[in-house]
Swiss-Prot record:
Ribonucleoprotein found in the keyword field: yes
Alphabetized Gene3D superfamilies for the sequence: Ribosomal protein L30, ferredoxin-like fold domain (3.30.1390.20)
Pfam family, one: Ribosomal_L30
GO biological process: translation
Subunit and interaction comment: Part of the 50S ribosomal subunit.
Protein name as it appears in the record: Large ribosomal subunit protein uL30
Family, per entry: Belongs to the universal ribosomal protein uL30 family.
Sorted UniProt keywords: Ribonucleoprotein, Ribosomal protein
InterPro entries: Ribo_uL30_ferredoxin-like_sf (IPR036919), Ribosomal_uL30_bac-type (IPR005996), Ribosomal_uL30_ferredoxin-like (IPR016082)
Length: 60
C-alpha cells in the first residue's frame, strides 16, 4: 500500500477549529513538519479539508 507524505506549509493558527483538529490528528505540529499517512479514503478526506495548508507527496 502506498503512503502519503504530508507536510504542513501554512500555520493552522487562526483557522477554523475543525481544521486545527484535523492538523493535530494527522500528527502535524509545526510548519514544515512532515508525517507519513496511509493512502486511504479517510486520510484523503481529511487532507481535502486542509488542502490549502499542506503539501502532499506519494511515497512508495
Amino acid at each position: 500500500m502506498a503512503q502519503l507524505k504530508v507536510t504542513l506549509i501554512h500555520s493552522a493558527a487562526h483557522r477554523l477549529p475543525k481544521q486545527r483538529k484535523i492538523v493535530e490528528a494527522l500528527g502535524l505540529k509545526r510548519v514544515n513538519s512532515s508525517v507519513l499517512q496511509p493512502d486511504n479514503e479517510a486520510t484523503r478526506g481529511a487532507l481535502f479539508q486542509i488542502a490549502h495548508l499542506i503539501k502532499v507527496e506519494e511515497v512508495k
